[in-house]
Amino acid sequence: MAYAVQDKRFAPSLLSFFIYNPKFGPREGEEEKKILFYHPNEVEKNEKIRNVGLCEAIVQFTRTFNPTKPAKSLHTQKNRQFFHEPEEGFWMVMVVKNPLAEKQKEGKTVLEYQEDELLDKVYSSVLQQCYRMYKLFNGTFSRAMEVGQVELLKDRLEKFFHRYLQTLHLHSCDLLDVFGGISFFPLDKMTYLKIQSFINRIEESLNIVKYTVFLYNDQLIWSGLEQEDMRILYKYLTTTLFPRYTEPELAGRDSPIRPEMPGNLQHYGRFLTGPLNLSDPEVKFRFPKIFVNTEDSYEELYLIVYKAMSASVCFMIDASVQLTVDFCRKLDSLVGPQLTVLASDICEQFNINRRISGSEKEPQFKFIYFNHMNLAEKSTIHLRKTPSMSLTSVQPELMKILGDINGDFTRVDEDEEIIVKAMSDYWVVGKKSDQRELYVILNQKNSNLIEVNEEIKKLCATQFSNIFFLD
């Protein structure tokens, strides 16, 4: 009996990643000075120089056609190169190996590179995200040059990217990486006012706090930061910091750290950054530093992340302030009990609202929504997104169509709608209207174009009743 041999498939993977500045080694024989960081480091010196030189040549060549917009990517059969100039003269390059299928043809193994599977916009966004994450924790390249010349910059790049590149799981990158949006927690006015009042009280009591951010269930409720800074901080919190503490919580619910509190208040609060055990007199701690408003005031801040149940608060304090154990104890005793009560209130209100709206059966559609003005993002396609994986509830073929539709939207300024019928008989709809984008996947194989259009109108009326979508 003959069995069909299954094709072996290999996902896209990181081949190399490097950062260079052509001005640092302008003369012959000094080419190595241009290279500020190169991964993998084991690559032979001459090959590094050759690869950087090739990228330089490509950028220079494409500048002759468009001086202000040089190359963003280079397609070859086996890989794809992405270029990004985040600061003048500093170039970041990411080389991704194309997905691969291993097939059997006439008894021989044949390799087929599937270069069409990679979407430029997705991986260009990932490269830009690499820079923004570096800048959040290290500041700009040029500031490092001002402070400690090229050696300091090289040292910072090595320390950061050596670890960060290990968290880049390119096989799970998709449209959400293009948007880099923020998921907002739905809240009634009264509970929102309680949170606002809590933040005002804390900022008044702890007057060294410069900015505050409040999240519940990994979704944003309040932020005092600028949008672009909040966007990358949100990415760090939800894909790196919070997941680190999720597993221990799932193993067994936290018991109150100090059940006996004045006024019999329960206290579930604890630091996610900083001191692990405040009752230890010898406790050693360090808060991470972040850099915000790098375009103008260039602020260096300590990041304190404090959590009680499902509520998390980030306090940002000027890095010139000396933070002591006494300050941490004061913050803990002040914030812990109040945040515990607030987290219970939010949970109760959320459950009431869910009961009122009713638990509907599994809908026949899944969607991604993004608003460019406030970076609001909502997805029923993604079950979970962490650095190591992105669980999606739809086939990769459909995710690729969503990316293609987004690419079409980018090329035009006008509002528009695109409807596609996939090979698997699913309907995929993209709608762009007034700085908002909506992508819907419909599992209605027997529907026609008119019926699909009606379904989309119904969806907009039920899920986005307060948002105006042009017909």
UniProtKB/Swiss-Prot annotation:
The entry's family comment says: Belongs to the CCZ1 family.
What biological process terms from GO does the record include?
vesicle-mediated transport
Recorded source organism is Xenopus tropicalis
Query: Among the entry's GO cellular component annotations, what is one?
Result: Mon1-Ccz1 complex
- State a single Pfam family of this protein: Intu_longin_1
Protein name per Swiss-Prot or TrEMBL: Vacuolar fusion protein CCZ1 homolog
Q: What is its main location?
A: membrane
The UniProt keywords, alphabetically, are:
Lysosome, Membrane
Q: Please indicate if the UniProt record lists Electron transport as a keyword.
A: no
The question of whether Membrane is a record keyword is answered with: yes
Q: Which domain of life is it from?
A: Eukaryota
Localization recorded for this chain is: Lysosome membrane
